[in-house]
Design a protein with these regions (language model features):
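Conserved N-terminal segment of class I S-adenosyl-L-methionine
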Residues: 1-97, 107, 111, 124, ...
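A generic structural signal for secondary-structure junctions
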Residues: 14-15, 87, 103, 151-157
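S-adenosyl-L-methionine-dependent methyltransferase catalytic module, highlighting the catalytic core
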Residues: 19-26, 36, 57, 81, ...
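A structural micro-motif
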Residues: 67, 88, 135, 182-183
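Acidic/polar helix N-cap motif
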Residues: 94-97, 101-102, 119
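Residues lining the SAM
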Residues: 111-114, 140
Length: 230
């Protein structure tokens, strides 16, 4: 595949993207973002950016909570699906160059988008730029320690996704947040093993014991909550 075809891979599968996503992963990420990271943050009336909106589940969840949502992705078909689902405002843009004014969002949500960008640290800086002072960035992304396993699964055609994937390491993600001027409030792991194994019930027992402990950096995915300081 060419670099461009990898960049726009998810745009090419926009009509079937949701059916290819794993339900257990989607459920857990929605919980992580809304029930955990934003549990103490009322969204009613808040301006929220869903960066890497995909087919719109996170946009819809934010709208349901009363937020004024902008759904952003790199492809027009993805944005169209997200806005149709959520009733949100759509923007087509690269996360590394948003084209939005500084300080215009109270909350920025980005779930499993960062790894698909050409420059993850640059994308974090852009997400931070459009945050208001005291605004929150809530981000989930795969952990780099699992990159080799995922690439092997892709080569063996065990997973349906062929887009650009550059996983970010635990420490690198914290450094990217710091370089963007953000204060990291929470950084934890989720999915103790690949969700494709179908051991969701067992994962829910094991995960709380590992998510914020010394082994958190070994988990499949990671979540960050960061604030833009005054």
């Amino acid at each position: 595949m060419t670099s461009r075809s990898r960049e726009f891979f998810y745009e090419g599968i926009a009509d079937r993207f949701e059916g290819l996503d794993h339900p257990a992963d989607v459920r857990r990420r929605l919980e992580v973002v809304f029930a955990e990271c934003l549990a103490q943050t009322p969204l009613a009336g808040q301006r929220v950016l869903d960066a890497g909106c995909g087919y719109g589940l996170f946009s819809a969840a934010a709208v349901e909570r009363g937020a004024k949502v902008v759904s952003l992705d790199i492809g027009t078909r993805l944005v169209a699906r997200a806005t149709a689902r959520a009733g949100s405002h759509g923007v087509v843009a690269d996360a590394c160059q948003l084209g939005l004014r500084d300080g215009c969002f109270d909350v920025v949500i980005s779930s499993e988008m960062l790894e698909h960008t050409a420059a993850p640290a640059g994308a974090v800086a852009e997400l931070a730029r459009v945050l208001k002072v005291d605004g929150l960035l809530v981000l989930t992304t795969p952990n780099r320690v699992w990159q080799g396993t995922v690439r092997a699964a892709s080569r063996l055609r065990l997973r349906p996704f062929r887009g650009r994937e550059s996983f970010v390491g635990w420490g690198r993600l914290e450094r990217a947040c710091a370089a963007a001027g953000l204060d990291v409030l929470a950084h934890f792991g989720f999915h103790p093993w690949p969700f494709q194994l179908g051991l969701e019930r067992a994962a829910r027992v094991v995960e709380p014991r590992l998510a914020r402990g010394p082994a958190a950096w070994l988990m499949v995915n990671q979540a960050v909550v960061a604030r833009k300081p005054r």
